[in-house]
Amino acid sequence: MSPIAHLLNASTGTDSGSHLRDIHGHHDSHDHGSEEQAVSPLSPRSYPSPRSNSSSSCEESQSSAGVLANIHTGPASPHGKACVASSPLSTTGMRSASTPSSSDEDTVHLHRCQWKGCSLEFTSPELLYHHLCQDHVGRKSQKNLQLNCQWGDCQTKTVKRDHITSHLRVHVQLKPFACSTCNKKFKRPQDLKKHLKVHNEELSLLKKKRGPKPSNKLGKISNDRSRAHQRFTLPSISLDKFIHEEVKTQQPVYSQQLAEKMAIVLLLPVNNNNATSPPSASSASSTAVSPNLVSHHMVLPYQTQQRPLVGHGAELRSAVGFFNNLSMDMSRNYANNNLPTANLGPNPVPAPQSYPLIPKLPSISARPNVGAPPPVLSVFNRFDTHQTSPSSSSSAFYPQHYSNNYSLHQRTALLDAEANEDIPEKDNVSLEESFTSLNLSSEEQDLELFYETYSTVKLVKDYLLCELMEELDEFKEEEEEQGFTSFDEFSDSKECVIEGRIPSNKISLSKYPQVVI
């Protein structure tokens, strides 16, 4: 019996799908001679040994399988191949759905360590850099310090640990220091500090073009423009002084007073060499020290070293935290479009000018009597029926009372004023429009002041963070040189030297001034 006849006879009593699966399995694993035994629903499935004539059996199996596929899906169905592909023999094609493909594995970029004798892989450059610093470079306190680079073919030799850790950033694609203004990333804090000078120059030029906005807002506009320009080119407060005085008293929340104070703060030095630039008055006063004190009590080993703009230690960390929280507060206000209003008290609103109903032209009889009374001419009193003397209730004090002392021209002016009583209302409307335009201009000034302060805060925050990172690197270097294991031990030793409890020759603090007793 042929497979097609057997399928047509068994379609009424048995499941056609089970017969199709049996026939597919039979034609792929047996020859044409054993088809009838494999498709019989009553006979058990047998697996005879394959014959040598495999080419003819394969052709007959493929032809019968194609006929069965056409019967199952129709002769013109486009899914005929899909039905054959979904057979148990094609399970290898379903592997991409159940298992990750090679393209998915390629999306995860692994960073391989190329140090001599190491082949570990890491998912991020941060982990690779940490592995290099801890496992391969080591520490002097652990007696495994390696100052020679062994990355691939690199043969760089250094003399300090911070030098080799800084050199490793060349091999590792690590840029952890990002600029808050333009989102550009750098490998070292020194590179970010150099980049911040570009934004500092842009912000300084912007302040010079806009001029002193806090004085304009309070209504204290100065006529001397050169003095206002000098105020912004030579600020009255330095960044160090602002951190000493304002950070400890102010809250890290944006306000109008804080913005006006930061508008006159000297930011980063524009020139690369601070020795050539003239120091400001505030910096000179803050750094003025008696020469006797310097010569007898202090020894500064690094005279050519650039003086930092801010302090060290806890003060620097407090300043970084202040500007970081202030930047977060201003970013939330910027995202919510919620700018705080000025907290300077109620602004005095000028009262609208009251226009008189009649011209301020007093009558002849209302003039003060100095000396002899002037003669009263008859031409002014030809319409009068009674001659009255000037008193407190005359028309000079009560304009609405039309006295007989007014002349013809004054009475005509009174009638014209009564006919034009709606003129002051129009003037009031124009005044309200001018006040509205002033309010809009003040809102624009507040918005510009907010953006300017936000840029300044981000610039100062990045600079202070770089200063803190450099100080931490210097501390680690000194820690390695002196063999300290913790910051507390280092601080206790420094305090002992300053207080004179131990001789200063046992420990040398090159970065800090030494007290000579």
UniProtKB/Swiss-Prot annotation:
Task: Show the GO MF annotations.
Answer: DNA binding; zinc ion binding
- Gene assigned in the entry: RIM101
Designated name of the protein: pH-response transcription factor pacC/RIM101
* Region of interest: Disordered: 1-105
User: In its keyword annotation, does this UniProt entry include DNA damage?
Assistant: no
Per the Swiss-Prot or TrEMBL record, what residue ranges does the short sequence motif YPX[LI] motif 1 cover? 355-358
According to the record's subunit comment, the protein's assembly and interactions are: Binds to DNA. Interacts with RIM20, which binds to the two YPX[LI] motifs and is required for proteolytic processing.
A cellular component annotation (GO) from this entry: nucleus
Cell compartments where the protein resides: Cytoplasm; Nucleus
Zinc-finger (C2H2-type) residue ranges come to: 111-136, 147-171, 177-199
Give the residue ranges of motif YPX[LI] motif 2: 512-515
- Polar residues: which segments have biased composition? 87-102
Q: Which UniProt keywords apply?
A: Activator, Cytoplasm, DNA-binding, Metal-binding, Nucleus, Repeat, Repressor, Transcription, Transcription regulation, Zinc, Zinc-finger
Residues of the signal peptide: none
Bias class Basic and acidic residues marks the residues at: 18-35
Function statement: Transcription factor that mediates regulation of both acid- and alkaline-expressed genes in response to ambient pH. At alkaline ambient pH, activates transcription of alkaline-expressed genes (including RIM101 itself) and represses transcription of acid-expressed genes.
